[in-house]
UniProtKB/Swiss-Prot annotation:
<feature type="binding site">
    <location>
        <begin position="26"/>
        <end position="30"/>
    </location>
    <ligand>
        <name>substrate</name>
    </ligand>
</feature>
<comment type="similarity">
    <text>Belongs to the uroporphyrinogen decarboxylase family.</text>
</comment>
<feature type="binding site">
    <location>
        <position position="75"/>
    </location>
    <ligand>
        <name>substrate</name>
    </ligand>
</feature>
<keyword id="KW-0210">Decarboxylase</keyword>
<feature type="binding site">
    <location>
        <position position="151"/>
    </location>
    <ligand>
        <name>substrate</name>
    </ligand>
</feature>
<feature type="binding site">
    <location>
        <position position="320"/>
    </location>
    <ligand>
        <name>substrate</name>
    </ligand>
</feature>
<feature type="binding site">
    <location>
        <position position="45"/>
    </location>
    <ligand>
        <name>substrate</name>
    </ligand>
</feature>
<comment type="subunit">
    <text>Homodimer.</text>
</comment>
<dbReference type="InterPro" id="IPR000257">
    <property type="entry name" value="Uroporphyrinogen_deCOase"/>
</dbReference>
<dbReference type="InterPro" id="IPR038071">
    <property type="entry name" value="UROD/MetE-like_sf"/>
</dbReference>
<dbReference type="Pfam" id="PF01208">
    <property type="entry name" value="URO-D"/>
</dbReference>
<keyword id="KW-0627">Porphyrin biosynthesis</keyword>
<feature type="binding site">
    <location>
        <position position="206"/>
    </location>
    <ligand>
        <name>substrate</name>
    </ligand>
</feature>
<comment type="pathway">
    <text>Porphyrin-containing compound metabolism; protoporphyrin-IX biosynthesis; coproporphyrinogen-III from 5-aminolevulinate: step 4/4.</text>
</comment>
<keyword id="KW-0456">Lyase</keyword>
<comment type="function">
    <text>Catalyzes the decarboxylation of four acetate groups of uroporphyrinogen-III to yield coproporphyrinogen-III.</text>
</comment>
<protein>
    <recommendedName>
        <fullName>Uroporphyrinogen decarboxylase</fullName>
        <ecNumber>4.1.1.37</ecNumber>
    </recommendedName>
</protein>
Amino acid sequence: MRSKNDTILKAIKGESTSHTPVWFMRQAGRSQPEYRKLKEKYSLFEITHQPELCAYVTHLPVDNYQTDAAVLYKDIMTPLKPIGVDVEIKSGIGPVISNPIQTVKDVERLSQIDPKRDVPYVLDTIKLLTEEKLNVPLIGFTGAPFTLASYMIEGGPSKNYNFTKAMMYRDEETWFALMNHLVDISIDYVVAQVEAGAEIIQIFDSWVGALNVKDYRYYIKPAMNKLISGIKAYYDVPIILFGVGASHLINEWNDLPIDVLGLDWRTTIKQADKMGVNKAIQGNLDPSVLLAPWDVIESRLKDILNQGLNRGKHIFNLGHGVFPEVKPETLRKVTEFVHNYTAK
């Protein structure tokens, strides 16, 4: 049995590491040929509902790319179906919900979640990975209340989130009832993942950049504080928060009791430090760069890694998820470069 690679856990705490840890959002699936073969036969939900298949997909990038963490293969919509949300993942579109939330009565009809009863396949996958002696920490995750709510209100992906914002401004009773419900189910869902063996949790707030600071502070931040504090009340598990196009919210995020602040590619590590970020930082190569020639990739890698080495407490990642078009050998080469360039 290989010894446990806990580099990412050390980096989060600010402890000395042998190299900068690296993993990639959406590293499990998408660009992997083995995964594409599975998708010819199974849907996303079918894979995530079969622990053996899901564990296999989760483990692949650790073996193929030598990443310093595994991220559980599943969708942020996973906990919504059991509470009464009729959600379907449609190819080329994303999550589509046939019963969007419109009134407080719609929120009241939502049930609570019992992870052991409602999503046993998620917990069984985590346990299976633990039993298989996964040699890196496993990252579990959940969607943030705003991002989950936006899907539930809009009925699917949106560019402007008009219905979501309209509810916030017009019907605070329904909005805050939905926020509180999503916080409650997310705490239970995350705690169950940790109890099953997840050692790090990432909260994806993918669409929160659509809000200005004032609205975030009033409509979202209390729920985020409640969610993160609620998880920490059970287990002091490291929590990463990531959003897209939300650099204007960095100061608000820095106030939250998170351990790691995830940056997209629009904000440099230096800029985040100048804004007073005192957490570990994760990021933040533009995923598009992975489609460029290697000399361009290497130049961008050096720039990001040098900024990370200067501040410490840095986890290398992309500024969003891996594109399906990215070649597996590119990801393997990036991981190798990060490890070698930052070796101490």
